[in-house]
């Protein structure tokens, strides 16, 4: 087990800054999460990236915004900027359930305390810093800011909100994975400094704001000159007046997010213009390795000694092997934030991190996950990448697997076997969700098909901790098409394979399917049929959720506007509490307390034929 000193973490207090012998800081980061020095926690990654650039960086985790604001003053003014991360989750998803009830636990806070971050920390922290230090640049990052960079529907306010740049007063927003833009930003900032001991002002930042990819900023409409190839969205005011325009905007936003080479996007709001610069091309393997190979302690800061951080407990024995997801699910923000192009770490970097994990206290030889946004997309990309560079499809596997996709599972099998061969590793489990549509896909390449069959058996026999998570999400092909998910028949086919391999290997593992109710396009009748089908398959569902509209997804825009952003055709969504509960109850057809309501609902919608299938003829 490694021994660490306090100075092995980035400083969080004046005393820790002084322990390093520093008398000033270049960058001060504020985070809505506790400080865990681990590559799964965004503030730690950005802090370490900036440290590797030779900057003096401190992190102030979960500052108190309700007192005399001493946490915002205690380290003074940085030379370059304040950086703000609301945390690893959108703060409103973190604080509220799909029914807008306050959650009792915050997984990213010591002992799960639910009161250590405000709603919208991106706005609250930024406004405080602008009040205290009006001329110091404030840079927003994290998923909360990233997905609110343009006009967006906010479920908790139940209205279309302006770009978060408007309400926060921040000077610049970095969207997506922030390593490349933050490095370029700081390098250009340093070039602007007139002397070694000088500080940068917000006014000086404006000189370079338009030159940094993957950032967004505000400027006065009178100062803005659009380029011919800019994509000019409907203004915020037009979107407020016409829901169809808000839906139409989203198609452009998503398509540009999924392009290899995107256009600049602009949107007018309040006599200003939000300018969203195109993203960087995907990171190289070397760049991703660099981010993960930085000197993380992989531990919570010592200030939390004796306290449990639930989110850390979940991932402390896991290793992330790639970024990006080309699934393009309509309700998911991963591709909007990480992109659809897969960037994979090298085998050497992964194995080095596994060896680091093995040094952690309490490690007993079991890795909880070797995965990413999806379990089985490692090193997958286009056979001809020139085709990918012209493509704007949101998904490489829906409605069908792209013929240009190389779905070879051999590189992933090689990683699993190399990890399991390390002395001291007893078992590596796969906790990420498995895309069974990739496992069932029949490529024109026989070797690829053999690798897929081998991977399927290897996964089920050696990497399941008793239960394998998969996400069919629904049984209705119509709803699944809106979700951009494969037909439920594919899940049934995969279940047969799973059950057969379990019989052959004398295993007693469970397949755990995840389902969503109240998704746009889903009606009570669809949920009733879901209940009948899952009963036939002998599932008593546990992993279920109501659809929660979160910013910057196709499903959210359809839910709010009533129109599908790509077709502008009307889409039904369950919105009232009664409509949502009427759908949700069908997950639990097997519970005696739900039976009466379900029977009444089936009669109300004229589907008495399903009563026999759920409960038998005597209940008609």
From Swiss-Prot:
Domain of life: Bacteria
Protein's UniProt name: UPF0313 protein BT_0254
An example Gene Ontology biological process: methylation
Coiled-coil regions listed in the entry: none
Cofactor descriptive note: Binds 1 [4Fe-4S] cluster. The cluster is coordinated with 3 cysteines and an exchangeable S-adenosyl-L-methionine.
SUPFAM superfamilies associated with the record: Radical SAM enzymes
Keywords annotated in UniProt: 4Fe-4S, Iron, Iron-sulfur, Metal-binding, S-adenosyl-L-methionine
């Amino acid at each position: 087990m490694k021994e660490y000193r306090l100075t092995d973490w980035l400083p969080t207090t004046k005393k820790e800054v002084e322990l390093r012998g520093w008398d000033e800081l270049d960058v001060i980061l504020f985070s809505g999460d506790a400080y865990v020095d681990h590559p799964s926690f965004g503030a730690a990654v950005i802090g370490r990236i900036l440290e590797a650039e030779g900057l003096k960086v401190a992190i102030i985790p979960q500052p108190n915004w309700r007192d005399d604001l001493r946490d915002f003053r205690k380290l003074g003014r940085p030379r370059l900027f304040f950086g703000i991360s609301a945390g690893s989750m959108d703060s409103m998803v973190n604080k509220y359930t799909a029914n807008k009830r306050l959650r009792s636990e915050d997984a990213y806070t010591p002992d799960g305390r639910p009161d250590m971050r405000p709603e919208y920390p991106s706005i609250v922290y930024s406004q405080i810093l602008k009040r205290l230090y009006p001329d110091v640049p404030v840079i927003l990052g994290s998923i909360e800011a990233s997905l609110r960079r343009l006009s967006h529907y906010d479920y908790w306010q139940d209205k279309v909100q302006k770009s978060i740049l408007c309400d926060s007063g921040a000077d610049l927003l970095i969207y997506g994975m922030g390593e490349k833009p933050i490095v370029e930003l700081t390098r250009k900032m340093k070039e602007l400094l007139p002397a070694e001991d000088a500080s940068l002002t917000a006014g000086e930042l404006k000189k370079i704001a338009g030159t940094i990819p993957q950032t967004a900023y505000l400027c006065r409409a009178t100062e803005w000159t659009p380029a011919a190839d800019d994509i000019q969205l409907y203004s915020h005011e037009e979107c407020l007046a016409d829901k169809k325009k808000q839906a139409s905007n989203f198609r452009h936003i998503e398509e540009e997010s999924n392009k290899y080479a995107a256009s600049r996007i602009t949107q007018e709001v309040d006599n200003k213009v939000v300018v969203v610069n195109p993203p960087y091309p995907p990171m190289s393997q070397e760049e991703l390795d660099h981010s993960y190979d930085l000197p993380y302690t992989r531990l919570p800061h010592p200030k939390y000694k004796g306290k449990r951080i639930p989110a850390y407990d979940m991932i402390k024995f896991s290793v992330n092997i790639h970024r990006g997801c080309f699934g393009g699910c309509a309700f998911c923000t991963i591709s909007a934030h990480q992109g659809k192009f897969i960037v994979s770490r090298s085998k050497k970097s992964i194995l080095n991190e596994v060896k680091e994990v093995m040094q952690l206290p309490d490690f007993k030889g079991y890795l909880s996950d070797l995965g990413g946004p999806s379990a089985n997309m490692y090193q997958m990309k286009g056979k001809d990448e020139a085709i990918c560079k012209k493509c704007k499809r949101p998904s490489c596997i829906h409605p069908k697997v792209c013929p240009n996709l190389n779905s070879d599972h051999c590189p992933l099998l090689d990683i699993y076997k190399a990890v399991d061969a390390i002395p001291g590793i007893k078992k590596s489990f796969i906790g990420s969700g498995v895309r069974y549509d990739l496992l069932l896909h029949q490529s024109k390449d026989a070797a690829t098909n053999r690798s897929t069959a081998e991977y399927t058996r290897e996964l089920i026999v050696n990497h399941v901790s008793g239960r394998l998570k998969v996400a069919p999400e629904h049984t209705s092909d119509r709803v699944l098409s809106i979700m951009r998910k494969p037909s439920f028949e594919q899940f049934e086919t995969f279940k047969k394979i799973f059950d057969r391999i379990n019989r052959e290997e004398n295993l007693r593992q469970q397949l755990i399917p995840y389902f969503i109710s109240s998704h746009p396009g889903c009606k009570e009748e669809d949920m009733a049929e879901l209940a009948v089908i899952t009963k036939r398959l002998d599932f008593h569902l546990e992993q279920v959720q109501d659809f929660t509209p979160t910013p910057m997804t196709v499903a959210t825009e359809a839910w709010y506007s009533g129109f599908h952003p790509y077709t502008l055709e009307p889409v039904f969504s369950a919105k009232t509490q009664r409509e949502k509960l009427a759908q949700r109850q069908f997950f639990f057809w097997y519970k005696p307390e739900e039976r009466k309501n379900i029977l009444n609902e089936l009669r109300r919608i004229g589907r008495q034929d399903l009563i026999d299938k759920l409960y038998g003829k005597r209940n008609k």
